[in-house]
From Swiss-Prot:
Belongs to the ATPase alpha/beta chains family. One of its GO terms (cellular component) is chloroplast thylakoid membrane. It is found in: Plastid, Chloroplast thylakoid membrane. This is ATP synthase subunit beta, chloroplastic.
């Protein structure tokens, strides 16, 4: 981290103008730059191209050195569009990696990959900046305590609980609710934990980024009157950005989160939507950098790139970064190298199912596919563990019986199996929950359900005490008391209809 004596923008100081090169070749987002002998920039140094295009428009493009080619040439990846650049243009070596503003000044603001504000709310205090490339914390600094991170979402807290300071993956194909789940987590965590969040929008839709910002302003997560009281900093490198920006925007967000952890000694939440786009951007650039493609056309450096990002997301003795990452699964194939590489780094996986989404059960979290290293009796306690296992067993048995039901019907099942199916259907519906951020779509007010309430509810269903209630009563409710109240209401309505 660098403390700059004065607040200055990302411009280049006169000191750093000593090292000048010229553009030798441009292939899409990749530039080759020739430097004088003995004046080669280091790998990851930021280069700035300044000048005017043929129409006289001002050009200011920042690039990052990726390779030293020999013959006094370097190959760099542009962080913004290369429109208007021509061969022979002057390139300035800044002598350091990209640095971005960090600290309280970033809260409530939206940044791009370079740490420049893009929300039209004026300049940001850049006296404290930090380079985006750093080493992961040393082993001796790491914190190894286990504790649960309560989210207020029943299916998550019961069946695949999150670890404080852990890494969580949200897996799902297109349109099954990854972004809505992330928005709900930001909302719940800001309200229940009062923690600071950093949101990295990596290669996703600009519209979603805008919706998220508006939503945060409405819910008070971003305080427009006093930005310093906001609970989140936003960093966007959306779908329309060049691959260089999408490849580095995750590191920009992580750098801001690291400052809150290491200097402010806070517990931080880092949201990355979507980690697959980080890999995708790397693969777009990889071929242009002259690397041989690996399996399924991905970059050969896939594991290294992923590791260098993920190893920095961890808990230290000062504070923690709990990271929740949406993972787009291409063609719903979990064996694809991108999601498969991500799996290796995660403490918990929340898998979203298209089948459940089609049934209208939201959040569409697959209770049997989602996993967590925290679901052990010595960590969560015997009661929680037993309840979770019995819920899974009931749902698994229901899954096994579905073929028989489809062919022969429910009547052919034994009494015991029919009871299991009835309870499993209630459990399936009780795992749904109205979200605060989806109130406008569902018309139901959002619900935050504490862990103790969640366990109590599922124990009652499993014990058979609620066998007499209709399964519809368990759909889109908060705790179990709401389900019993809804059952009474449904009974009244049916009597009135008669």
């Amino acid at each position: 981290m660098r403390i700059n004596p004065t607040a200055s923008g990302p411009g280049v100081s006169t000191l750093e103008k000593k090292n000048l090169g010229r553009i030798a070749q441009i292939i899409g987002p990749v530039l080759d730059v020739a430097f004088p002998p003995g004046k080669m920039p280091n790998i990851y140094n930021a280069l700035v191209v300044k000048g005017r295009d043929t129409v006289g428009q001002q050009i200011n493009v920042t690039c990052e050195v990726q390779q030293l080619l020999g013959n006094n040439r370097v190959r760099a990846v542009a962080m913004s569009a290369t429109d208007g650049l021509t061969r022979g243009m002057e390139v300035i070596d800044t002598g350091a990696p990209l640095s971005v503003p960090v600290g309280g000044a970033t809260l409530g603001r939206i940044f791009n990959v370079l740490g420049e504000p893009v929300d039209n709310l004026g300049p940001v205090d850049t006296r404290t900046t930090s380079p985006i490339h750093k080493s992961a914390p040393a082993f001796i600094q790491l914190d190894t305590k286990f504790s649960i991170f309560e989210t207020g979402i029943k299916v998550v807290d019961l069946l695949a609980p999150y670890r404080r300071g852990g890494k969580i993956g949200l897996f799902g194909g297109a349109g099954v609710g990854k972004t809505v789940l992330i928005m709900e987590l930001i909302n719940n965590i800001a309200k229940a934990h009062g923690g600071v969040s950093v949101f990295g929008g990596v290669g996703e839709r600009t519209r979603e980024g805008n919706d998220l910002y508006m939503e945060m302003k409405e819910s008070g997560v971003i305080n427009e009157q006093n930005l310093a009281e906001s609970k989140v900093a936003l960093v966007y490198g959306q779908m329309n950005e060049p691959p260089g920006a999408r490849m580095r925007v995750g590191l920009t967000a992580l750098t801001m989160a690291e400052y809150f952890r290491d200097v402010n000694e806070q517990d931080v939440l880092l949201f990355i939507d979507n980690i697959f786009r980080f890999v995708q951007a790397g693969s777009e650039v990889s071929a242009l950098l002259g690397r041989m493609p690996s399996a399924v056309g991905y970059q050969p450096t896939l594991s290294t790139e992923m590791g260098s990002l993920q190893e920095r997301i961890t808990s230290t003795k000062e504070g923690s970064i709990t990271s929740i990452q949406a993972v787009y699964v291409p063609a719903d194939d979990l064996t694809d190298p991108a999601p498969a590489t991500t799996f290796a780094h995660l403490d918990a996986t929340t898998v979203l199912s298209r089948g459940l989404a089609a049934k209208g059960i939201y959040p569409a979290v697959d209770p049997l596919d989602s996993t967590s290293t925290m679901l052990q009796p010595r960590i969560v306690g015997e009661e929680h563990y037993e309840t979770a296992q019995r819920v899974k067993q009931t749902l698994q048995r229901y899954k096994e019986l579905q073929d028989i039901i489809a062919i022969l019907g429910l009547d052919e099942l034994s009494e015991e199996d029919r009871l299991t199916v009835a309870r499993a259907r209630k459990i399936e519906r009780f795992l749904s929950q109205p979200f605060f951020v989806a109130e406008v779509f569902t018309g139901s007010p959002g619900k935050y359900v504490g862990l103790a309430e969640t366990i109590r509810g599922f124990k009652l269903i499993l014990s058979g005490e609620l066998d007499g209630l209709p399964e519809q009563a368990f759909y889109l409710v908060g705790n179990i008391d709401e389900a019993t109240a809804k059952a009474t209401q449904l009974e009244m309505e049916s009597k009135l209809k008669k």
